[in-house]
A protein has these predicted regions:
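Catalytic-core regions of hydrolytic enzymes
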Residues: 11-27, 33-131
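Hydrophobic membrane-insertion alpha-helices, especially the h-region
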Residues: 1-8
Length: 131
């Protein structure tokens, strides 16, 4: 979430040679996990998938106010797999990747709440491809 706020607050952020404020294009938002996959389950039974979806919806609203077209890959607690699928997780990931390839967004943000055994590990993580 901090990364998203940072990107939204910068007028000169560079992305593929253009500033995101010039483009005002499509941004896909992937709220990690969902359906049968809860992700990390925290103290008190809070599920990562629920936190991710809430953050994704808030981020979509903020992006739309800035003039972007924000599309949620997952809009509710359902996974992206068929009920009869033998490997739901694989099908879910394949459908997420297919949507990204088909839509060709300006940016895709995948939201997760990672957990580590080492309590000293904290803060945001950002993964990206370097072209």
């Amino acid at each position: 979430m901090l990364c998203a706020v940072y990107l939204l607050s910068r007028e000169g952020a560079m992305l593929t040679g253009k500033s995101i404020t010039e483009e005002k294009g499509l941004i896909l938002i992937d709220s990690g996990h969902g359906g049968i996959d809860p992700g990390v389950v925290g103290i008190g039974g809070v599920k990562e998938k629920d936190i991710n979806l809430k953050i994704a919806k808030e981020l979509a609203g903020a992006l739309e106010k800035k003039g972007y077209k924000a599309v949620l890959i997952r809009k509710d607690d359902n996974g992206l797999y068929d009920a009869e699928s033998k490997n739901k997780k694989v099908q879910d990931m394949q459908k997420r990747c297919a949507m990204i390839k088909e839509e060709k967004p300006l940016l895709t943000v995948s939201i997760h709440q990672n957990s580590y055994q080492d309590e000293a590990v904290c803060g945001p993580q950002v993964f990206y491809y370097k072209d």
